Design a protein with these regions (language model features):
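Short, structurally constrained coil/turn elements
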Residues: 52, 76-78, 101, 184, ...
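Histidine- and/or cysteine-centered catalytic micro-motif in compact active-site loops
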Residues: 193, 233, 251-255, 272-274
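A ligand-binding cleft/hinge motif common to bilobed small-molecule-binding domains
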Residues: 114-118, 246-266
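Short, flexible turn/loop "capping" segments at secondary-structure junctions
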Residues: 49-51, 150-151, 198, 274-277
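Short, low-complexity disordered leader/linker segments with a strong preference
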Residues: 1-53
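Short, polar/charged alpha-helical segment
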Residues: 41-51, 57, 61-81, 158, ...
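Extracytoplasmic ligand-binding site segments that recognize negatively charged/polar headgroups
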Residues: 57-71, 83-99, 103-244
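Extracytoplasmic/periplasmic substrate-recognition and gating elements
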Residues: 235-238, 262-277
């Protein structure tokens, strides 16, 4: 990594935000010296070294609003210029693999874990024993070798437009197998397997559920009903409320965002009855 100390400092902040929720801590000044939030206690040397590096570059795979807020908060706290590029998780994986140990960014922030695991296995991530990893509620939310640490979790499921289903006199799908019904042909949106970590997780989930061969067969059969493959994992959710997408596969928190932020009361969220990731 080019800016190692700033990278470590960013990870400390990310894990601390997991524990603190939406609380926004600002540095307090005592004369010319800044006093930072308590979770940075004892890290003065790290902060000084990070500032000396001057800039932090972030690849972000979460929603851009969240990414921008995190980067802005880091910059405000430490006075370190922070820039980001928003890419789907699969795109970041491909970019890191192409850069092959000579990265143009310092931090990978957000997204699904499968691409992180691939890059870790390829030796493309920097392990770090984070001081604040104890803020995570379980070891399952971090890599065993400290290559990555979780900052949020989501549930994979279906988002449906209830108005459109009623108009077509259709029942909402209750489970994965329902998505293969002929009546849903041309109604389902899913993200692209080549670019979106969400879609890669769908593949992983089906293989775990059905076994490799049957899982791949399921995906081939599902393709017959897919109308659109979006670049980003959140793409389907953004089109359900308008009715352009009747059934979207993705993380349910993306559907909640559409309901809360955009007032789409015609969006219903479904957790597959036989299980999910």
């Amino acid at each position: 990594m080019k800016k190692f100390f700033a990278l470590l400092l960013a990870l400390v902040m990310a894990l601390s935000l997991v524990a603190c929720g939406e609380k926004k801590d600002e540095p307090k000044t005592d004369g010319d010296a800044a006093t930072y939030p308590e979770y940075f206690a004892g890290m003065d040397e790290l902060i000084t070294a990070a500032k000396a590096e001057g800039e932090l570059v972030v690849y972000g795979s979460c929603e851009e609003e969240y990414l921008a807020a995190a980067c802005q908060h880091f910059e405000e706290l430490f006075g370190i210029k922070t820039t980001f590029q928003r890419l789907s998780t699969g795109e970041v994986q491909a970019k890191i693999e192409e850069e092959n140990g000579n990265p143009s960014a310092d931090v990978w922030f957000g997204g699904t874990t499968d691409p992180y695991n691939v890059c870790a296995a390829e030796g493309l991530l920097e392990p770090y024993a984070a001081v604040n990893a104890s803020h995570l509620i379980s070891d399952m939310y971090k890599d065993a070798d400290n290559n990555w640490f979780g900052i949020y979790k989501g549930i994979l499921g279906f988002m449906v437009n209830t108005d459109e289903l009623a108009r077509k006199e259709q029942e909402a799908p209750a489970d994965w197998a329902d998505l293969l019904k002929d009546e849903y042909k041309g109604e389902i949106w899913l993200s692209n397997y080549n670019t979106a970590g969400t879609a890669k997780l769908v593949v992983n989930t089906m293989i775990q559920k059905y076994g490799h061969d049957e899982g791949i067969k399921y995906l081939v059969d599902l393709d017959k009903n897919i109308e659109v493959y979006t670049k980003s994992g959140s793409g389907p959710s953004k089109n359900v409320g308008t009715g352009e997408c009747i059934i979207g596969i993705g993380f349910l928190h993306d559907g909640i965002t559409q309901i809360v932020d955009n007032g789409y009361t015609n969006v219903s969220l479904i957790i597959p009855s036989s299980g999910t990731s």
